[in-house]
Amino acid sequence: MSYVIDRRLNGKNKSTVNRQRFLRRYREHIKKAVEEAVSRRSIMDMEHGEQISIPGRDIDEPVLHHGRGGKQTIVHPGNKEFTAGEHIPRPQGGGGGGGRGKAGNSGEGMDEFVFQITQEEFLEFMFEDLELPNLVKRHLTGADTFKTVRAGIANEGNPSRINIVRTLRSAHARRIALTGSSRALLREAQKELDRLRVEEPDNFTDIQEVEQEIERLKARINRLPFLDTFDLKYNLLVKQPNPSSKAVMFCLMDVSGSMTQATKDIAKRFFILLYLFLKRNYERIEVVFIRHHTSAREVDEEEFFYSRETGGTIVSSALKLMQEIMAERYPASDWNIYAAQASDGDNWNDDSPICRDILSKQIMPHVQYYTYVEITPREHQALWYEYERIGDAFPDTFAQQQLVSAGDIYPVFRELFQRRLAT
C-alpha cells in the first residue's frame, strides 16, 4: 500500500496564499474597518472576526478601453429593431452599488465586496504597529530558547536524517569516476566487435576474443556496488541560540470608592486590551496584577478583573508594592520592566507627592516604560500634575493619557504603544 504525505505549508487550504495576498493588497480598507469595529464593539467581545466591506470601485482592475465620446464605425449583426443608417443611442451611465437611493430603470453598477476575516486576522490588524517600547535583548534564558536549524551536509548522522538526493548524487559520481576507464574500453571493444561482424564475419577467433573482453569489462563494472557507505550524506542540524527578552508587565488598577462602576469598567477594558496585546505578541512575558484602594494587593487574573472589593484611595500603596516585587523577583539587570496604571486621579492630597517621590527615585530608573491612564471627564487633580513632573524628568520612558469614555480606549492604547523608530 502506498501513502501520500502532504508536506505543503498550507495543507488542504489551497487559497491561503491568495487570501494573504488579498489582505496585503487591501490592508488600508481592512485596517480602517477593524478600527471602526473596535470602537463599536466591547473589548471583551473578541471571540470572532469581523465582516469587511470594500467598495466595488476599489477592487476593479485597471484596463485599457475606448473612452466615451467620439464616433465609431462598427459592423453589427442584423436584427429586427434597427435598419441601415440608424443611430444607436449611447448607453446611459449609471453607478449602482450598495448605497441607499430611489429605484431607477436605467444604469448599472457594482455592490460592495463583503468578506469575513478570522479572529486571528482581526487581532493582527488590531495590534499592527504596536510594541512594548525599549525592549532590550538581555540574556539567553535556558535551553528552550535554542532552535534547531539546517547547517549543511554531513558524512555521518542519524539514519532518519539521510539526504536521499545528495546520497544518490554522490553514489552516481563515484560510479562514474571508478568505472570511467572500464566504460571507455567497453565502448572501444563494442566498436571493434561491430567492425569484425561487418568486415570479417568469418573470423570467429577474433570475434570470440572481443566478446569475452566485453563480458569481462561488463562484469568489472557490475561488481562496483550501487551504494557504498562512503556515499551516505546526512542533513546536519545544529542548535542555534535564540536570544529572548525577559519582560514583566505590572498592571496597577485603582478600585477605590471614588471609582464609579462605569469608570471601573473602562479601566478593566483597557487592561483586557493590554492583556490581549501582551499574550498575543510576546511569548515570554509575565504579568503582575495589583489592585489597590487604601492598601494594595497582588492578585491573580480572575480576581483582578472581577473582584468587587473597594475602599479609600492611597495610590502610593500600589507603587510601594510594585517596588517590593521588583526588588524581590524582577531585578532590572535581567528583566525588561513595564507598568500600566489606571485611576480616576482622585487621591489623598498628601499622598500624591509621595507617589511622585517613589516613582522618580525607586521605579522610573529601573523600568523600560511606564504608562498612566486617568479615567475622568473632570478637571485633573493633584496626582496628574505630580505625574506631569515625572514626564518632564523621564520623557522617553513615561507617558500619560486621559480617558473620558469607552470610545477613547483603543485610540489612547495605540498612542501609548505605537511603534517607535529606532534612534
Swiss-Prot record:
Residues 92-107 have a biased composition (Gly residues). Residues 81-108 are annotated as: Disordered. Signal peptide: none annotated. Belongs to the UPF0229 family. PANTHER family: UPF0229 PROTEIN YEAH. This is UPF0229 protein PP_0396.
